[in-house]
């Protein structure tokens, strides 16, 4: 019970007994006054039966009042016991209510902590996903840069090889021209022998140039082979044919 129980408005047995005693005294005084009056009038005898009847009525009324008083006293005690019991039950219910409210508060705090932890885990998972995506993009960018550097290096090597190849071909054409030209001075045979030796060296350089290009092509991605249309490679004559 939430409110305080109000005390019952029941009169105490002592007050009831006092009221009953006063009524009894008044009735006794009335009887004495009646007896004295009858004695003076000389008519006491005819009124004895009436007096006895009234006394019996008073005794019955007294007995009934005593029984009502005992019942009232018993009811008063029972109501007070019930009031004490209800007060005790009220205290017990207030204690239970306090415990339930404390348990509810703890449960709400626990739920809030769980929700906060779930939000932190969600944010952490999203952050890890973003970091993973950023790492993949960074690795792809680094790979792209490395491949671009390798491609530029291969292109420079290709240009260098083409330049060397054109230079060697020019030297070969010069040597062949000199070999096929008629001798004009003495000692032309010695010059031809030197030119043949130089031609052999240039031929070896020409044959080794494609091998170097093929070796570098294995290290990096395959590039389209450029065709030197301006300076086609002439057939190299064998030294013995000269």
From Swiss-Prot:
Domain of life: Eukaryota
Ranges for region Disordered: 1-24, 206-242
InterPro entries named among the record's database cross-references: SYCE1
Residue pairs linked by disulfide bridges in the UniProt entry: none
Gene Ontology CC: intermediate filament cytoskeleton; synaptonemal complex
Keywords for the protein's UniProt record, in alphabetical order: Coiled coil, Meiosis
GO terms, biological process: synaptonemal complex assembly
Chain segments annotated as coiled-coil in the UniProt record: 44-181
Pfam family, one: SYCE1
Primary role: May be involved in meiosis.
PANTHER family: SYNAPTONEMAL COMPLEX CENTRAL ELEMENT PROTEIN 1-LIKE
Stated family: Belongs to the SYCE family.
Protein name: Synaptonemal complex central element protein 1-like
């Amino acid at each position: 019970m939430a409110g305080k129980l109000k005390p019952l408005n029941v009169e105490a047995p002592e007050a009831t007994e006092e009221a009953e005693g006063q009524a009894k005294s008044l009735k006794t005084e009335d009887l004495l006054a009646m007896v004295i009056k009858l004695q003076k009038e000389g008519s006491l005898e005819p009124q004895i039966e009436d007096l006895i009847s009234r006394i019996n009525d008073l005794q019955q009324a007294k007995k009934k009042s005593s029984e009502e008083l005992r019942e009232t006293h018993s009811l008063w005690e029972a109501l007070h016991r019930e009031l004490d019991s209800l007060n005790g039950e009220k205290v017990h219910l207030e204690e239970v209510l306090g415990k339930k409210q404390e348990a509810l508060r703890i449960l709400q705090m626990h739920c809030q902590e769980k929700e906060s932890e779930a939000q932190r885990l969600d944010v952490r998972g999203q952050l890890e996903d973003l970091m993973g995506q950023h790492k993949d993009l960074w690795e792809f960018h680094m790979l792209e840069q490395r491949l671009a550097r390798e491609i530029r290096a291969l292109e420079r090597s290709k240009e260098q090889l083409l330049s060397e190849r054109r230079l060697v071909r020019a030297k070969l054409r010069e040597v062949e021209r000199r070999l096929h030209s008629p001798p004009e001075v003495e000692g032309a045979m010695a010059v031809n022998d030197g030119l043949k030796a130089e031609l052999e060296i240039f031929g070896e350089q020409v044959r080794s140039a494609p091998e170097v290009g093929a070796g570098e092509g294995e290290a990096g991605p395959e590039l389209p082979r450029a065709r030197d249309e301006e300076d086609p490679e002439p057939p190299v004559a064998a030294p013995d044919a000269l």
